[in-house]
Amino acid sequence: MKRNLILLGFLVALLISCRLTQFNPFRRVIEHSAPELTVDNAYFKDLGCFQSVDCLPEEFTNRPYPVQSIYQVSDLLGGLRPELPIAIAGNVTFYDEEKVPSVYSQNCMASFAVRYLIVVDGQMRLVDSYEGMREIYAPIENEDEALSYAVALTGYSAYYDIKSNSDYKILAKPLEETYSRFDGEVFTVHLFNDFLCGCGPHITESVDVTVTQDGEISLSEPVDTFRDVTMDDLCID
């Protein structure tokens, strides 16, 4: 009888040990729901801007750093207020060329400068600085607006439903998906820098963007969060 009890205890301990090995609370993902945001691209689409920069007023082509290409913005910018027609004005330069003034840039062997075309009071503006964006969109009054503003000024990405992608190797413990929170004074927007440059493995970093109500932003130190193993062998210049 005693021997049977010892054997039973051993089996229970072994089972618990196996379950604890499988359950690692430090690898959990803290999930958040994606906001329902959309951007109306009709203004620039109707002008044909997504096909050619010839849609731009003449003064835009005669100024320094003329726009090379125009792109639709992400629906994540749909929280910006006032709600104005907006599109990305892109310029590509290389390391030996003069940098283009921009709201933000993504830099590798080539540099992609992001400015915005925004229609204010019926007039199209080319906004090429953080101050220009702040002038148009401050004050920041709610969490969706803070999310859109942070994405627009940094180019960082929002990630949701991370657990559904089996190709992601989780590095942060825990990994928290994108959120936007207001503590009564400032907004904190949790985003991800997934810009690819060089050879893999490519690590996606999480960054907290602090947004004040008057439109100032500051960035936390980046934290290695996850990597997509399907891109480990990818090299990008």
How would you describe each model-predicted region?
Residues 24-169:
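Extended, low-hydrophobicity segments enriched in charged/polar residues
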Residues 116-119, 201-221:
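A short, surface-exposed beta-strand/turn
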Residues 218-237:
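Short, low-complexity, Pro/Ser/Thr/Gly-rich segments in the mature regions of secreted, periplasmic
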Residues 193-205, 227-229:
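Short, cysteine-centered beta-strand-loop-beta hairpins and adjacent loop/turn segments enriched
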Residues 1-4:
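Positively charged n-region of N-terminal signal peptides that target proteins for export
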Residues 184-196:
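Generic short beta-strand segments
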Residues 19-21:
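Bacterial signal peptide processing site
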